[in-house]
Amino acid sequence: MADSKAKPAKAANKTPPKSPGDPARAAKRLSLESEGANEGATAAPELSALEEAFRRFAVHGDTRATGKEMHGKNWSKLCKDCHVIDGKNVTVTDVDIVFSKIKGKSCRTITFEQFQEALEELAKKRFKDKSSEEAVREVHRLIEGRAPVISGVTKAVSSPTVSRLTDTSKFTGSHKERFDQSGKGKGKAGRVDLVDESGYVPGYKHAGTYDQKVQGGK
């Protein structure tokens, strides 16, 4: 038998729809959220001139280097290029000893902090007549803003041996005959003795004019 009782109708949702709101208020909220995100983000610290120089030398010659650590070879180059090594108070040996002392036993590189410690060690030797703080500042001035010196550029070398082999005016014998006075090669004439069968004496100024004179006299 069918249920004669009518089921109660569901109550209509009387909650009014949310209004889109004020566009200006929404824009202000987004602006505040953006400012909060920017404040929360950590800004990249600005590098000092000393650390910039450290990174330039740290990546020199190594495409995989990050610039955060420096090998002994680049450490020695930095000390040489920046004139920390003066050959008197600080030598290459001093630089190597300090590097071995500062780096870890199982490490082959030094960090920027260790780099600063190494400079303090060398500063005592480099500027003996200054206080510790002044000596460190002087060493920093030698390095700040510097970059590796690129070597290996080919330069023209002037030596007696090279000049003797390249200056054609100094050639003797058969080699001299291969070039004219300007140094230009004569080609085949400079390599082979060509026989002049014209009948004229070599050096005769009027060579080749006999036929013209005979024909002109007729």
Swiss-Prot record:
One Pfam family assigned to this protein is p25-alpha
Query: Which residues lie within the region annotated Mediates interaction with LIMK1?
Result: 1-115
Which GO MF terms does the UniProt record name? GTPase activity; magnesium ion binding; microtubule binding; protein homodimerization activity; tubulin binding
Under SUPFAM superfamilies, the record lists:
EF-hand
Q: Which InterPro entries match?
A: EF-hand-dom_pair, TPP/p25
Query: What top-tier enzyme class does this entry carry?
Result: hydrolase
Reactions accelerated catalytically: GTP + H2O = GDP + phosphate + H(+)
The question of whether Nucleus is a record keyword is answered with yes
Q: Look up the EC number in the record and give it.
A: 3.6.5.-
Q: How does it assemble?
A: Homodimer. Binds tubulin; binding is inhibited by GTP. Interacts with MAPK1. Interacts with GAPDH; the interaction is direct. Interacts with LIMK1 (via the PDZ domain); the interaction is direct. Interacts with LIMK2. Interacts with HDAC6; thereby inhibiting the tubulin deacetylase activity of HDAC6. Interacts with aggregated SNCA; may have a pro-aggregatory role in synucleinopathies. Interacts with DYNLL1. Interacts (via C-terminus) with S100A2, S100A6 and S100B; these interactions inhibit TPPP dimerization.
User: Can you name this protein?
Assistant: Tubulin polymerization-promoting protein
Q: Which gene encodes it?
A: Tppp
